[in-house]
Each structure stands twice: as structure tokens, then as C-alpha cells.
């Protein structure tokens, strides 16, 4: 009797569950995965090389386009690395704003993750609910930067502008009736901080709603429990960070272990898993959303009570006020030089990392004293996690490959860069 040989299957790069342009070459014995070989590079845009041809400030929009669902977290690592080289102090209010928006970005990322992960596995409803909440966070992005996604809001020395005193209002139009506009504007009568506070006060109930849909759902547990198990020792050997590492039971979070900005002033817990499977990683991320919401509430309370500057007073990095620039020749020259030639960063090298929604996102910069980086290296957490795809999926069924891709929370903007 002829022996059935293993066969090869191409998964992606156009597959809806591939989370971008992932090409996965699978070697299958029936429906059991024997080997999984990820092929990357289909979204390579030479970001690290392009960064060498742009000024330090011009590179900030490139950061938004790395992990394009965690925009401000990418910016944060980059501007902190520049601040290390410049030895610039950041005003306390700007630090609180950065932390608040980092945590809003974490919610933005995790909401997309739970929506798409649920959709991949077969849970449709949670996708719709998650995108409802994401809309409010996009409005918060738009309020400070004018852009719903690629904000370019952080700057070396602080943030681009202070939080606005008035949320933008919807107007009646062909696509929105008067009653719809009234409903949309109900919670937009106050400041941006009021809008964020109202969102945060109701968000925990929304997370409970997601958990009610999924946590004890029999089909959800069958698809996630004991799938993609990684032991604590192996997670460290593979270089896991973020929820992938904490899901294996290791309590490592840069916000606690290597505090930056004002995280050491804030109260929050680090959720960890027990079994290291996809279900534990799901539980970790769900609890992370609650902890992020708790941090956001603390930041809102502090920011309401403490007005102040949001940009460094060091004129080598901070532009003049717009009114001064338009009425004073010296300020006009200062503004012109700052945005044409750019800032000159002293010789040296610096590495800065943040607790990104996906793990440790790091930027390594080398400066030769010029107005452009000599070298920029990006440490993307998704790159490390995807490299474990073969090990995590071996011996599982073909349908489980989708679950493992979902639990890794992969975005190709940062992997291919």
C-alpha cells in the first residue's frame, strides 16, 4: 500500500486571517501541521534606511507607520531615544499626556486584536462591539493631532500641543440627521479630558461585555485552550516580551521593571498567565485593558488639576509660539531653521524602549552630530513572536494556525519595516 506523503500548502499572503501580508508555507500530514515557515518582507519599505535621509523631526511620521495600530507608542520610543541623546527634560504635564495616550493606544490595539481574533475563530459580534469603542479613541487622537490614525503628536521635549478645551462637534449633513447629530454630540459638550473621562468610566463595563461573550464560551475555549503552549523558560529563550511573555507566567513589564515617564507614580497591576496557552494570553490582554483604563483615569484626574507647559523650554528643540513667529524676525528665523535644517543632536548612541501593546518596542539611535540620524535600528516585538510560529504550531491542526497567528497579535508594518 502506497504511503501518503506530507504535502505543502501556501497560507496567504492574501488570506483574510493572515493579519497583513503573511505568507506561511505549511507542511501538512493530513490536517496536522508538521512545519510552518513564515515568509516575510512583502511590506518592506526600508524605514531604517529612509530615516537616515530625513531630519530627526521628519522621522516621527515614519514611526506611526510601523505598527499602524499602535501609533503613539511607536513615536514614544523614538522621541525618548532623541531626548536621551539631547539630555532634554520633559515637562511633567507632557509626561502625563504621553502616558495617557500610550494607554489609549494600548486599548486601540487590544480592541483590534480581540475583534480580529474573535472573527478569525468565528465570533462575529465582538468584532462589531470592539470597533464601536475604537471610534471614540480615534476621536481622541483627532482632537489633539488632527489625524485619526497617524498622529505625529509626540515631539522631542514634549508633545505638539496641549489638550484642547473643546471637543469637536458633529454637524448635520446629508449622511447625518439632526437626531443622529444630537446623539453623537451628547458627550462632546465639554473638554477633551471630559470626553476621555466619560469614555473611561464606561469602558470597564464594555470589557465585561466582551468577557461575557467569550471567556466561558464553550467553542471559544475549545479553540484556544492548550493551543500554542509556550513554557516560561522557552518564552525567555525565544525573546518573548509583552503579553506573549506574561501569558507564560513571567511578570515582566517595562512600565514596572524599568519605569519611564510617570509610570512609577501610577497604580496598576501586571496580569500574568499560568498555562502559557492562547487562552491565557487572551485573559492577560483582557485584564490589561482594565489596567490601562485604570491608568487613564488617574492621568485624567492629574491633568485636570495641574495645568502647565507641555513642551521643553530648551529652544534648541522647541519651536517658538506661532504668534511670536509671525510678529518677531528672530523667532521667524528660529522657526525656519528648526524646520528646514532641523535640530543637531550631539554625538552618541542611545537605546530607548517602551512597553508597547505587543511587547518591548525599542529604538536604537546613533548620532554623528548631524541633523539626521547616522543609524536607526528598530526592535519590533512582532518580529520575535512570528519567528516562533513553527515551534508553536507544530503538531496542531491546520485550523489552529489561525488561532496562533491571532494570539501572537501580528502587524506587518513593524515586522517588515
UniProtKB/Swiss-Prot annotation:
NDH-1 is composed of 14 different subunits. Subunits NuoB, C, D, E, F, and G constitute the peripheral sector of the complex. PANTHER family: NADH DEHYDROGENASE [UBIQUINONE] IRON-SULFUR PROTEIN 2, MITOCHONDRIAL (PTHR11993:SF10), NADH-UBIQUINONE OXIDOREDUCTASE 49 KDA SUBUNIT (PTHR11993). The keyword Heme does not apply. It catalyses: a quinone + NADH + 5 H(+)(in) = a quinol + NAD(+) + 4 H(+)(out). It is found in: Cell inner membrane. NDH-1 shuttles electrons from NADH, via FMN and iron-sulfur (Fe-S) centers, to quinones in the respiratory chain. The immediate electron acceptor for the enzyme in this species is believed to be ubiquinone. Couples the redox reaction to proton translocation (for every two electrons transferred, four hydrogen ions are translocated across the cytoplasmic membrane), and thus conserves the redox energy in a proton gradient. InterPro entries: NADH_Q_OxRdtase_suD (IPR001135), NDH1_su_D/H (IPR022885), NiFe-Hase_large (IPR029014). It comes from Polynucleobacter necessarius subsp. necessarius (strain STIR1). This is NADH-quinone oxidoreductase subunit D. Its EC number is 7.1.1.-. The gene is nuoD. GO terms for cellular component: plasma membrane. One of its GO terms (molecular function) is NADH:ubiquinone reductase (non-electrogenic) activity. It is a peripheral membrane protein. It is an enzyme of class 7 (translocase). Keywords: Cell inner membrane, Cell membrane, Membrane, NAD, Quinone, Translocase, Transport, Ubiquinone. The keyword Oxidoreductase does not apply. Belongs to the complex I 49 kDa subunit family.
Amino acid at each position: 500500500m502506497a504511503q501518503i506523503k506530507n504535502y505543502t500548502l501556501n497560507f496567504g499572503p492574501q488570506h483574510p486571517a493572515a493579519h497583513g501580508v503573511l505568507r506561511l508555507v505549511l507542511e501538512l500530514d493530513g490536517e496536522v501541521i508538521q512545519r510552518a515557515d513564515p515568509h516575510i518582507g512583502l511590506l518592506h519599505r526600508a524605514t531604517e534606511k529612509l530615516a537616515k535621509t530625513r531630519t530627526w523631526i521628519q522621522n516621527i511620521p515614519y514611526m506611526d507607520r510601523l505598527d499602524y495600530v499602535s501609533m503613539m507608542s511607536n513615536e514614544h520610543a523614538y522621541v525618548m531615544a532623541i531626548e536621551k541623546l539631547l539630555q532634554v527634560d520633559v515637562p511633567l504635564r507632557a509626561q502625563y499626556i504621553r502616558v495617557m495616550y500610550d494607554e489609549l493606544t494600548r486599548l486601540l490595539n487590544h480592541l483590534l486584536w480581540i475583534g480580529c481574533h474573535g472573527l478569525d475563530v468565528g465570533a462575529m459580534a465582538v468584532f462589531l462591539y470592539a470597533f464601536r469603542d475604537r471610534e471614540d479613541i480615534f476621536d481622541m487622537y483627532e482632537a489633539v493631532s488632527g489625524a485619526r490614525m497617524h498622529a505625529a503628536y509626540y515631539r522631542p521635549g514634549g508633545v505638539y500641543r496641549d489638550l484642547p478645551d473643546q471637543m469637536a462637534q458633529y454637524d448635520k449633513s446629508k449622511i447625518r440627521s439632526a437626531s443622529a447629530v444630537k446623539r453623537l454630540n451628547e458627550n462632546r459638550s465639554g473638554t477633551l479630558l471630559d470626553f476621555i473621562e466619560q469614555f473611561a468610566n464606561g469602558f470597564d463595563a464594555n470589557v465585561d461585555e466582551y468577557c461575557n461573550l467569550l471567556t466561558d464560551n464553550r467553542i471559544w475555549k475549545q479553540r484556544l485552550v492548550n493551543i500554542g503552549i509556550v513554557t516560561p523558560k522557552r518564552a525567555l529563550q525565544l525573546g518573548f516580551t509583552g503579553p506573549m511573555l506574561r501569558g507564560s507566567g513571567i511578570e515582566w513589564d517595562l512600565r514596572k521593571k524599568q519605569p519611564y515617564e510617570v509610570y512609577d507614580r501610577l497604580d496598576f497591576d501586571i496580569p500574568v498567565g499560568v498555562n502559557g496557552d492562547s487562552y491565557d494570553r487572551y485573559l492577560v490582554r483582557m485584564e490589561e485593558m482594565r489596567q490601562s483604563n485604570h491608568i487613564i483615569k488617574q492621568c485624567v484626574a492629574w491633568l485636570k488639576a495641574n495645568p502647565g507647559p507641555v513642551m521643553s523650554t530648551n529652544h534648541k528643540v522647541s519651536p517658538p509660539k506661532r504668534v511670536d513667529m509671525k510678529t518677531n524676525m528672530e523667532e521667524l528665523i528660529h522657526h525656519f531653521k528648526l524646520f528646514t535644517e532641523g535640530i543637531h543632536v550631539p554625538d552618541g548612541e542611545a537605546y530607548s524602549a517602551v512597553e508597547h501593546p505587543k511587547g518591548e518596542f525599542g529604538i536604537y539611535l546613533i548620532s554623528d552630530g548631524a541633523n539626521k540620524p547616522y543609524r536607526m535600528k528598530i526592535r519590533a516585538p512582532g518580529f520575535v513572536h512570528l519567528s516562533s510560529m513553527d515551534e508553536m504550531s507544530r503538531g496542531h491542526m491546520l485550523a489552529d494556525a489561525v488561532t496562533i497567528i491571532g494570539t501572537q497579535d501580528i502587524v506587518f508594518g513593524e515586522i517588515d519595516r
